[in-house]
Regions:
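Short beta-strand
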Residues: 4, 42-45
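Short amphipathic alpha-helix segments
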Residues: 22-33
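C-terminal structural segments of small proteins and small subunits
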Residues: 53-79
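Short, well-ordered beta-strand elements within core beta-sheets of diverse protein domains
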Residues: 10-18
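Short proline/glycine- and acidic-rich turn/helix-capping motifs at secondary-structure junctions
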Residues: 45-53
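Short aromatic-glycine-(Arg/Gly/Cys) micro-motifs in beta-strand/loop hairpins
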Residues: 1-8
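Helix N-cap motif at beta-to-alpha junctions
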Residues: 19-20, 58
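Short arginine-rich
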Residues: 31-40, 77
Length: 79
């Protein structure tokens, strides 16, 4: 579940992985989606996780940002 944060307003989620190779595949899918949707989250990762923060332009999450986050969730569930 994505968490809403304030100052600055954003949504965040951490994805856990049991293999580093899965992180690389996941990040590749995110890169392609970012280019398609013109949304570029802050991304950090380690040997077993990827964390994403999507900064919101408005006071609430837009449909574009909701769809983007749901697509990322789908990528994660594919692995």
């Amino acid at each position: 579940m994505w968490k809403e944060r304030e100052s600055p307003l954003r949504i965040e989620k951490r994805f856990e992985f049991d293999q580093y190779s899965k992180i690389s595949k996941f990040m590749g899918k995110i890169e392609k989606l970012c280019k398609e949707r013109d949304i570029y989250p802050n991304i950090s990762f380690g040997k077993n996780f990827v964390s994403l923060s999507i900064f919101l332009d408005n006071k609430e999450i837009s449909d574009k940002e909701k769809e983007f986050s749901m697509d990322i969730d789908k990528f994660y569930l594919e692995d």
